From Swiss-Prot:
Keyword entries, A-Z: Amidation, Pyrrolidone carboxylic acid, Secreted
Positions bearing Pyrrolidone carboxylic acid: 1
Sequence similarity: Belongs to the tachykinin family.
Native organism: Phoneutria nigriventer (Brazilian armed spider)
Phenylalanine amide modifications at: 10
Protein name: Tachykinin-like peptide-VII
Main localization (coarse): secreted
């Protein structure tokens, strides 16, 4: 999911 990818930045 795109959201999960974004969370990876954190």
């Amino acid at each position: 999911q795109k959201k999960d990818r974004f969370l990876g930045l954190f």
